[in-house]
Amino acid sequence: LLKEKPDTIYLYKKDDKNYLQITVKEKVYDTVEAIFNENKHEYGKYSLNNKFIYVKEKTDNLMIDEYSIEDVNMNKLARGIFDKKDNIRVSSNNEMTDGYGILKPQGNRIIYTNPSSEDGKEVDATTAVTNAINFLELGYNEDVSYQVTTALEGITILQQTYKDSIVFSKDGSAEIIVEDNTNGIYRLTSPRRISKAYLSSKPLGTYDIERIEYVINYLYKHVELQSVDDIVLGYEKSYNKTKNTCSYVPMWYIKYNDRYVSFKSLKEAVDKGERL
């Protein structure tokens, strides 16, 4: 894994002259290598429009996993994100406010808004991501992992992660959208329900997911390759209202024109002659 195994490592922080010196024992490298070998995955390397994309090729033994779900604790969330924690009021339609920010359930999502922060100037993408993560740490820590998938001026989108991959959903219940400016976060959309306890798994059918070679060939023939930025073997998260559960179904996703769309949806649109 590592060609060189130095016994001293120096850690530097950007724009800081100070550093941390760490003495490393030889067995630490053995431990790191063992963990790496246990968790590594094989990726295929494909060229699309003169850029390389690395994709998990193995689609055998994929499972559809089912979990119980529960609602996010709105009271706990409000106490975490509101500034005026002693002045939180709840309306008849479950809308919560501290006199500045507003927190309310809406369908499968929770919407936070702060009207007093709407008139600021846009911030750059790096600042937007930093602000988003700092705000989420105040109360959006329900043991669900997310990663940033879109970073633009004033807007950050984070997708839920599952089994080392990205989760998507048609109703937005697997993503967090943060909008901010120089006055702070003024709107944040997050899932209302989260998966809790593992219930069961069943094998994915042989023909329920395409081979990566088929996906690549289809893209070459039918779409503008310069608009394709990524291909991931992700999961579609869907709810069963009758059983009050959610399922994670393996599925190919294409990042096309800066947004992720399932390969099935992309193919359906192309086959119908619809504009992507």
Predicted features and spans:
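Helix N-terminus capping/helix-initiation residues
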Residues: 27-28, 73, 164, 211, ...
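Short, non-transmembrane alpha-helical segments in secretory-pathway proteins
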Residues: 74, 115-154, 199-241
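Short acidic-glycine loop/turn motifs at beta-strand connectors
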Residues: 14-16, 25, 106, 179-183, ...
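Exposed beta-strand-loop-beta-strand "reactive/processing" segments of non-cytosolic proteins
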Residues: 80-101, 108, 136-185, 231-260
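Hydrophilic extracytoplasmic domains
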Residues: 182-276
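Short, low-complexity, polar/charged sequence segments that are solvent-exposed and flexible
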Residues: 30, 176-178, 273
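Preferential activation on post-signal-peptide N-terminal prodomains/segments
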Residues: 1-138
